[in-house]
UniProtKB/Swiss-Prot annotation:
GO cellular component terms attached to this protein's record: plasma membrane
Entry-linked SMART domains: G3P_acyltransf (SM01207)
Pathway: Lipid metabolism; phospholipid metabolism
Membrane topology (UniProt): Multi-pass membrane protein
GO biological process terms, semicolon-separated: phospholipid biosynthetic process
Family recorded in the similarity comment: Belongs to the PlsY family.
General function of this protein: Catalyzes the transfer of an acyl group from acyl-phosphate (acyl-PO(4)) to glycerol-3-phosphate (G3P) to form lysophosphatidic acid (LPA). This enzyme utilizes acyl-phosphate as fatty acyl donor, but not acyl-CoA or acyl-ACP.
Protein name: Glycerol-3-phosphate acyltransferase
The keyword Cytoplasm appears for this protein: no
Keywords: Cell inner membrane, Cell membrane, Lipid biosynthesis, Lipid metabolism, Membrane, Phospholipid biosynthesis, Phospholipid metabolism, Transferase, Transmembrane, Transmembrane helix
Gene: plsY
Pfam families assigned: G3P_acyltransf
C-alpha cells in the first residue's frame, strides 16, 4: 500500500500539472493566461480573457484534477489522511506544473475537487461561501481567501485525520493569493 500511495501522489502531481487554462488558450488561439489579464492560469482569468465557455471548461478540468486522484485513492481503500496528501499533490501540480515551467494557477478549483472527493459537505460549504462572497464583493480572490479556511473547522469536527493535509492545502492557496491580499489591502484588487 505504501508503494501505491507514492504512485498516486506522483500521478496526482502530474495530473494536477495539466493546465486547462493554458491548453484551452492554445487550442483556441487565445493568449497565454499567464501573460494576459490577471496573469493567472485559472478559470477566473479565462472568464475575463476568453469568455464563459472556456472558463467553464477550465473550471471543470481543474476541479477534476483534484477529484479524480481522491476517487482512485478512496477506491483503493486508502485512509482519509493519505487521500488528503494525495490531494495536496494534485494542487501542487496545479500551482507548479512540470509541463509549463512550474508557472501555474492558484489552485482554488483543484482544491474544490479535492474537498469534493474527501468530504462533500466541506466542498459544499466552500462553494456556498465562495459564491456568497463573490456575489457580495464581486472579488474572486477575496471569495477564495474566505471560503478555503472556512472548511477547516468542519473538517476538524467531522474528519480530523484530513485536517493536517487540508491545512497545508489552505496555506498554499493563501500563499498563492499573497499578491491579491496586498491589492485587497491597498484597495486595488480587480472586481467582476
Amino acid at each position: 500500500m505504501v508503494r501505491m500511495f507514492w504512485l498516486l501522489t506522483t500521478f496526482a502531481y502530474l495530473l494536477g500539472s495539466l493546465s486547462f487554462a493554458i491548453l484551452l488558450s492554445r487550442l483556441s488561439g487565445r493568449p497565454d493566461p499567464r501573460a494576459s489579464g490577471s496573469g493567472n492560469a485559472g478559470a477566473t482569468n479565462m472568464l475575463r480573457l476568453a469568455g464563459k465557455k472556456l472558463a467553464i471548461l477550465t473550471l471543470l478540468g481543474d476541479l477534476c484534477k483534484g477529484l479524480v486522484p481522491i476517487l482512485i485513492a478512496s477506491t483503493l481503500s486508502m485512509d482519509i489522511a493519505q487521500q488528503g496528501w494525495i490531494g495536496v499533490c494534485a494542487v501542487l501540480g496545479h500551482l507548479f506544473p512540470v509541463y509549463f515551467r512550474f508557472r501555474g494557477g492558484k489552485g482554488v478549483a483543484t482544491a474544490a475537487g479535492v474537498l469534493l472527493g474527501l468530504y462533500p459537505p466541506a466542498a459544499a460549504l466552500a462553494i456556498v461561501a465562495w459564491l456568497l462572497t463573490l456575489y457580495l464583493t464581486r472579488t474572486s480572490s477575496l471569495a477564495a481567501l474566505i471560503a478555503t479556511p472556512l472548511t477547516l473547522p468542519l473538517l476538524a469536527w467531522q474528519e480530523p485525520h484530513a485536517l493536517l493535509p487540508m491545512s497545508v492545502l489552505t496555506l498554499l492557496i493563501v500563499w498563492r493569493h499573497r499578491g491579491n491580499l496586498r491589492d485587497l489591502l491597498a484597495g486595488r484588487e480587480r472586481h467582476f
